[in-house]
Amino acid sequence: TLDSLARAGTYAEIYPVYPSNTFPSHYAMATGLHPDHHGVVNNNFYDRKIGRKLSVFDAEDVRLPGFWSGEPIWNTAERQGLTANIFMWPGSEVPIDGHQATVWTPYSSKPTYYQRADWVIEAMTRPEAEIPELVMWYFEEPDATMHTYGPDSPQAVAQAEHIDSVLRYFFREIRRSPVFERINFIVTADHGMAALSPERYINLMPLLDTTQVIRTVPGTPFGLEVKEEYADTAIRILRRTGHMKAWRREQMPRRFHYGTHPTRLTNIIVIPETGWTLDYAAETRLVRKRGTHGFDNRDRDMHMVF
């Protein structure tokens, strides 16, 4: 299905914003802003202004004033007198600056992908005067399967084939829309996926002076807040260890467009080599995931379709 779309239109291999993770990337697509500027600097982060960790998966956190910055495209459309229908797109289920799309659907894993396709088909096959000008929808697959089984697993291939069949159904049915010839379709992703293994694991706790560590924000990238006088020493240790890159947040390479948010980034940012897992624990823990993202966005494993 994607091949036929590419032949009918255009396509490109693109790389995501950094960090190459779900919510930062989706909200970047919605706002046109890098995560440093739209505020969702990772799926989970520590906000020094509030004084605690926040998560995009926490229903109360995402409703905090100022959690989301920037203006998502559905609010821009509505301000211009257009109608937006947004189905499960990250960030759409909460008011941002007091505004939301005309129609929005909170995330739920219960509706099948064919049912989700039907939501869009129904919206676009109404009488022309009732058709929304902007529709956005989100699938969590094959991402979820790739996390569990790995990007090259038979399960991931089967899930990708299932999504392809849903898209084939969607593009067949959407031709009934009275405005079909005027619709611009974009099919894209939020990031790529890299394979993980238990052997590619580094526990940072034994490497660092734990009395100098204030907090950690696990994930990819790995957030490390240390006492200021220990920062340079910690960075030297991490770089010497290998399989990772570490910077003070204000010294991140410019190409990442990352490191300037005033309250939501630790003073050291650590990006593991693609395929490696970083941890901070009293005991070594088994890497159970078989795939993840968040690595250097220029790495081809992080690239995505457009």
List each language-model region with its residue ranges.
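A long, amphipathic alpha-helix that forms part
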Residues: 1, 111-125, 142-183
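Short, structured active-site-proximal loop/turn typified by the sulfatase FGly-forming signature C/S-X-P-X-R
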Residues: 1-37
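Loop/turn elements at helix/coil->beta-strand transitions in domains of secreted/extracellular proteins
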Residues: 8-10, 79-85, 129-135, 179-184, ...
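Structural recognition of the beta-strand scaffold that forms the well-ordered cores
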Residues: 12-15, 28-30, 75-76, 83-88, ...
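His/Asp/Glu-rich, glycine-adjacent segments
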Residues: 33-151, 242, 279-280
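Acidic/histidine-rich catalytic neighborhood
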Residues: 178, 182-183, 189-229
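Active-site neighborhoods of enzymes that stabilize oxyanions during catalysis
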Residues: 216-306
